[in-house]
Amino acid sequence: MCSLGVVIPPYGKRRNLRAFFILKGDDEMIRVAILVDGGYYIKRANRLFGQKTAAERATELEEYCKKHLLQDKTGTYLYRIFYYDCPPCDKNIYHPFLQRNINLKKSDLYTWMNTFLNELKSKRKFALRMGRLSSNDTGYIIKPEKMKALCANKISFSDITEDNFRLDIK
């Protein structure tokens, strides 16, 4: 017999992990499955721990997940780490400010993300669950704070720069 419990960690020590599952079997060994929201983790890790190479970030994630098991020390066993994310976008997208197409496949972020995902695939206990990006809802938009200032006539369109745009992918 196996029981299943879902634990959503508080915003304390485990704030980078959204949830993890605890599977308890008859042998009293607690098997833990950790679920990682990939986009959220990368964003938070870059902010908290700084920029790193793809291999360093993958190793960091593995150690970070295992550290949660060591803190508990109640006979836990790592069943699997489920990493949820989408593959990087490889489209040509029109940039309205530059007035030209940007090939995202040639970007450093595309290369880094593919390397990172390949690193995770090669690690033990990791299972990647890849989603799909919408094919129609992709483009550059003006950042909300600049759009608000533009609509309130606090700035004019001539004050808008390339840095005021961000890629919006859904």
Predicted regions and their residues:
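Short, Lys/Arg-enriched N-terminal segments with co-localized hydrophobic residues
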Residues: V6-E28
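Domain-level signal for Mg2+-assisted phosphodiester chemistry and nucleotide/NA-binding surfaces
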Residues: F21-A152, D159-I169
